[in-house]
């Protein structure tokens, strides 16, 4: 399956779930978050459900065993995905659904990568400076010592790189250009 076909299918299913859930969006959102966490912690279950040789009836049984945490509409939606033999799309569909929910509620999820864990006050300063983007709901502070200092903020497809490593890399590149200029190579 081509990437665009895959993305179109994922988007179509996610929009369908979004439209079906519109009156109870917060409930379905929590269920989807639970389900994604469950599949990430129990990845073998997802692999089992994605296997083409497992019957639709058996897949339905497994999903209904998780039913105490899921609404009937979400279980039926998942059953449709399985019936259409699209179980391999399930995690992507659920993640895309959460993206649609965040967009509809003007929320933003950001990741701040820093050399050390940031204090709450530092996180607050960064999030306040990004307030023009929309309401920031979740901040994930990932630690990556390789950036040496500063931080890198990711939101959506955007990146703000204020890391020391990036700054030093740019200085190295500029110094190479200057050396080449002095030697009349440029």
From Swiss-Prot:
The answer, when asked if Cell inner membrane is one of the entry's keywords, is no
Topology in membrane: Peripheral membrane protein
Q: Which GO molecular function annotation, any one, does this entry have?
A: proton-transporting ATP synthase activity, rotational mechanism
One protein family per Pfam: OSCP
- Record's InterPro entries? ATP_synth_OSCP/delta_N_sf, ATPase_OSCP/d_CS, ATPase_OSCP/dsu
Q: Where in the cell is it found?
A: Cell membrane
> What UniProt keywords are attached to this protein's entry?
ATP synthesis, Cell membrane, CF(1), Hydrogen ion transport, Ion transport, Membrane, Transport
- Could you name the domain of life of the organism this protein comes from? Bacteria
Q: Which residues form a coiled coil?
A: none
Task: Quote the cellular component terms of the Gene Ontology held in the record.
Answer: plasma membrane; proton-transporting ATP synthase complex
NCBIfam families in UniProt: ATP_synt_delta
The role this protein plays is: F(1)F(0) ATP synthase produces ATP from ADP in the presence of a proton or sodium gradient. F-type ATPases consist of two structural domains, F(1) containing the extramembraneous catalytic core and F(0) containing the membrane proton channel, linked together by a central stalk and a peripheral stalk. During catalysis, ATP synthesis in the catalytic domain of F(1) is coupled via a rotary mechanism of the central stalk subunits to proton translocation.
Q: Which family does it belong to?
A: Belongs to the ATPase delta chain family.
Q: How does it assemble?
A: F-type ATPases have 2 components, F(1) - the catalytic core - and F(0) - the membrane proton channel. F(1) has five subunits: alpha(3), beta(3), gamma(1), delta(1), epsilon(1). F(0) has three main subunits: a(1), b(2) and c(10-14). The alpha and beta chains form an alternating ring which encloses part of the gamma chain. F(1) is attached to F(0) by a central stalk formed by the gamma and epsilon chains, while a peripheral stalk is formed by the delta and b chains.
State the protein's name.
Answer: ATP synthase subunit delta
């Amino acid at each position: 399956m081509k990437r665009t076909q895959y993305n179109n299918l994922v988007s179509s299913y996610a929009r369908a779930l979004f439209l079906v859930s519109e009156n109870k969006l917060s409930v379905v959102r929590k269920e989807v978050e639970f389900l994604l966490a469950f599949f990430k912690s129990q990845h073998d279950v997802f692999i089992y459900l994605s296997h083409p040789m497992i019957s639709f009836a058996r897949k339905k049984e497994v999903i209904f065993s998780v039913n105490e945490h899921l609404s009937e509409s979400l279980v039926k939606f998942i059953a449709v995905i399985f019936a259409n033999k699209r179980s391999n799309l399930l995690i992507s569909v659920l993640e895309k659904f959460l993206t649609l929910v965040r967009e509809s509620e003007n929320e933003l999820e950001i990741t701040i990568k820093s050399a050390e864990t940031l204090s709450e006050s530092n996180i607050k300063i960064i999030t306040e400076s990004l307030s023009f983007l929309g309401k920031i709901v979740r901040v994930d502070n990932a630690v990556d010592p390789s950036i040496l200092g500063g931080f890198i903020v990711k939101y959506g497809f955007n990146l703000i790189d204020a890391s020391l490593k990036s700054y030093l890399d740019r200085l190295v590149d500029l110094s190479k250009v200057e050396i080449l200029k002095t030697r009349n190579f440029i």
